[in-house]
Amino acid sequence: MTSLDPAPNKTWELSLYELQRKPQEVITDSTEIAVSPRSLHSELMCPICLDMLKKTMTTKECLHRFCSDCIVTALRSGNKECPTCRKKLVSKRSLRADPNFDLLISKIYPSREEYEAIQEKVMAKFNQTQSQQALVNSINEGIKLQSQNRPQRFRTKGGGGGGGGGGNGNGAANVAAPPAPGAPTAVGRNASNQMHVHDTASNDSNSNTNSIDRENRDPGHSGTSAASAITSASNAAPSSSANSGASTSATRMQVDDASNPPSVRSTPSPVPSNSSSSKPKRAMSVLTSERSEESESDSQMDCRTEGDSNIDTEGEGNGELGINDEIELVFKPHPTEMSADNQLIRALKENCVRYIKTTANATVDHLSKYLAMRLTLDLGADLPEACRVLNFCIYVAPQPQQLVILNGNQTLHQVNDKFWKVNKPMEMYYSWKKT
């Protein structure tokens, strides 16, 4: 027994944990305990490379395990100490190989290549979900989705407004004139064909009128030819004017009923006279009225679009004011009410002047509450009991030696416009009130 005792100059000092812990019971039967690989990871991991131990080396002094290459490199390039507990390691002679631990690892993980493949998959999945690049990609995808949805929303609103007001465009394509009694029904004449008919009729009437004028000026022609030309022109003009006038007026009424509301509905033009000289004016008036109605429908559609956009952007004014407009403030104690003998000033000492930069839509009440909270946090126990309840009055000095008390619901934007029109930090004063 004496041979097993440690040498007198080499004593093993037990730690508090080793002194207090109870020994674990030895398993003597065939009981198996299921242990997850994650719980074993910290035991089988090298503290230097954070990977599974390879060619395990154990320190003789503190019994910490490392990979052979890792600990040799650490001793060669760093301090001569254990990377885990900083105990002194002189050289490689302070290490010993641990083949039993390598055998244990090989029993748990027979194939190291399979283990490394699993670890690579886990790290790849982790990088996809948790890395900085994944965050950037997620933000970019969100911006793309927002940019795609925004034009679709505006196009839908524009199409809904244009469908009601665009009666003179595609809406007039399927408008049919009411049939006369005993006459066949006309279907599928659009607005461009109607304008083409009006232009053709006006050109025919102009050519007939010009031919009549030339024959009247030419004395060499016989009276019979002139009379026949006049008769043919007069016969053609009433028929064409009557047909075109009836179809135009009926079509205009249908288009007006379909496109214009009752308040802006235009009345149909009267049927022109049989004279051929008024025919071009009739065509021009029809075109002018159509253009004016198109402009009215476009203006109505623009009004709808503007209304929709106003509804979408409603409530953004205050946000833009609070973000874009910032005001710098210099808070000073009131020169008379917050004199040197004031309890709060004695507690504040050199912290009585405050420099603040805030948004323009902040109110005077916000500043008062900020001062109360800030001074309470800064002073803490130094704040006298009489000053525990902090109520402040806020003043502004538009002129030297002139202090104006401010209302609590006034915003800094209003105060700046009314009292302070100088491009420098606004000077404000505060006084402590007991009530």
Curated annotation (Swiss-Prot):
Transmembrane segments: none annotated. It is found in: Nucleus; Chromosome. One of its GO terms (biological process) is heterochromatin formation. A zinc finger (RING-type) spans 46-86. The keyword Nucleus applies. Its main location: nucleus. E3 ubiquitin-protein ligase that mediates monoubiquitination of 'Lys-118' of histone H2A, thereby playing a central role in histone code and gene regulation. H2A 'Lys-118' ubiquitination gives a specific tag for epigenetic transcriptional repression. Polycomb group (PcG) protein. PcG proteins act by forming multiprotein complexes, which are required to maintain the transcriptionally repressive state of homeotic genes throughout development. PcG proteins are not required to initiate repression, but to maintain it during later stages of development. Interacts with ORD. Component of PRC1 complex, which contains many PcG proteins like Pc, ph, Scm, Psc, Sce and also chromatin remodeling proteins such as histone deacetylases. This complex is distinct from the Esc/E(z) complex, at least composed of esc, E(z), Su(z)12, HDAC1/Rpd3 and Caf1-55. The two complexes however cooperate and interact together during the first 3 hours of development to establish PcG silencing. This is E3 ubiquitin-protein ligase RING1. It comes from Drosophila melanogaster. The gene is Sce.
